[in-house]
């Protein structure tokens, strides 16, 4: 776990805000030369990561269709909703008319967003701000987490002749605290236990440089289930280097990196949420709100696709692969 001192956090936040000044100023000056479009700030952690490629492409396509100006803001090294809220408030001061945010979950996150939503429309993407999705006051666009893990287990069943009784499993998620993580972990454990499988270990957290070593030291299992894109990539890397003791890897992923490990056989199957659709729907609903739609913004659930190595480059998957590569 990385522990930031108060001074380091302050410096990081100042750097992020400084970069944001340049990005927003340049973007808004450009738009004034053309036409006064609505300005939508999109706040994502590690926004340059490939896991967001499909999402950003969907946001960009919708912003062009809806004639909105999109500015993507990264929250790299920002570990709390307080800091994320400061970045959003700064974006508002610089002219943002609405915000789409992947929130950093926390006990006070919903309350912090209230001061923002009182000024401009706020749409969440990927997870709610708190730990209980049903109690969230904000519209969220995301895949059905319970459906994703249920499908993941079904794919394992297909490869094991419909019977996984006595088979051993490891469960890995890089996302620590979101409501989506709780739903995924709870759902996959319930499914496996119901079918008589044995869960030997659960691993949670972004493992960074030590990831391969930590994974390698886990008890050998028959199957490793990875519940998000980063964990797919880390487990796929470990599998490729023969450091997972022969375990089959199945995962929920949406980046070209995840597909790479599927293509080379390190991952057996991917369940891919429609991140393009999530981005497109988010932006469309936000701009409709800015254009005077009096209806409350609503939760939106996107679909998913199952892809395997044998059909990776099929005609059905060509569009999906194209979107991932944008």
State where each predicted segment sits.
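Short beta-strand segments enriched in small/hydrophobic residues
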Residues: 28-55, 72, 135-136, 167-177
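Hydrophobic alpha-helical
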Residues: 101-118, 188, 203-259
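Short, well-structured alpha-helical segments in soluble
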Residues: 82-97, 208-220
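Hinge/beta->alpha junction and helix N-cap segments in small-molecule ligand-binding domains
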Residues: 44-50, 73-82, 127, 139-148, ...
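Hydrophobic membrane-insertion alpha-helices, especially the h-region
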Residues: 12-27
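Hinge/cleft segment of the Venus flytrap/periplasmic-binding protein
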Residues: 9, 13-14, 172, 277, ...
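Hydrophobic alpha-helical segments within soluble ligand-binding/sensing domains
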Residues: 137-166, 254-258, 274-291
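Flexible loop/hinge segments that line or gate small-molecule binding clefts
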Residues: 108-144, 255-263
């Amino acid at each position: 776990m990385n522990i930031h001192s108060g001074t380091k956090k302050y410096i990081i936040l100042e750097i992020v805000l400084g970069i944001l000044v340049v990005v927003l100023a340049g973007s808004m000056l450009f738009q004034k030369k053309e036409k006064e479009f609505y300005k939508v700030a999109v706040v994502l952690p590690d926004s340059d990561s490939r896991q967001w490629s499909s999402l950003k492409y969907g946001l960009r396509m919708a912003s062009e269709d809806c004639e909105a100006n999109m500015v993507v803001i990264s929250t790299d090294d920002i570990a709390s909703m307080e800091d994320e809220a400061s970045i959003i408030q700064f974006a508002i001061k610089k002219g943002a008319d609405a915000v789409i945010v992947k929130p950093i979950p926390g006990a006070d996150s919903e309350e912090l967003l209230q001061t923002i939503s009182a000024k401009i429309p706020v749409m969440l993407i990927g997870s709610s701000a708190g730990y209980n999705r049903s109690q969230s006051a904000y519209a969220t666009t995301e895949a059905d987490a319970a459906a994703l893990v249920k499908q993941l287990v079904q794919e394992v069943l297909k490869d094991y002749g419909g019977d996984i009784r006595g088979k051993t499993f490891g469960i890995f998620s890089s996302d620590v605290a979101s409501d989506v993580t709780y739903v995924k972990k709870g759902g996959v454990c319930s499914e496996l236990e119901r079918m008589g499988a044995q869960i030997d270990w659960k691993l949670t957290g972004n493992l960074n440089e030590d990831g391969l070593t930590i994974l390698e030291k886990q008890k050998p299992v028959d199957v490793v289930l990875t519940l998000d894109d980063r964990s797919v990539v880390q487990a796929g890397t470990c599998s490729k280097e023969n450091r997972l003791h022969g375990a089959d890897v199945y995962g929920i992923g949406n980046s070209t990196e995840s597909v790479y490990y599927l293509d080379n056989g390190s991952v057996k199957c991917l369940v891919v949420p429609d991140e393009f659709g999530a981005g497109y729907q988010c932006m469309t609903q936000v701009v409709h709100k800015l254009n005077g739609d009096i209806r409350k913004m609503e939760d939106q659930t996107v679909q998913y696709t199952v892809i395997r190595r044998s059909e990776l480059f099929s005609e059905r998957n060509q569009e999906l692969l194209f979107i991932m590569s944008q």
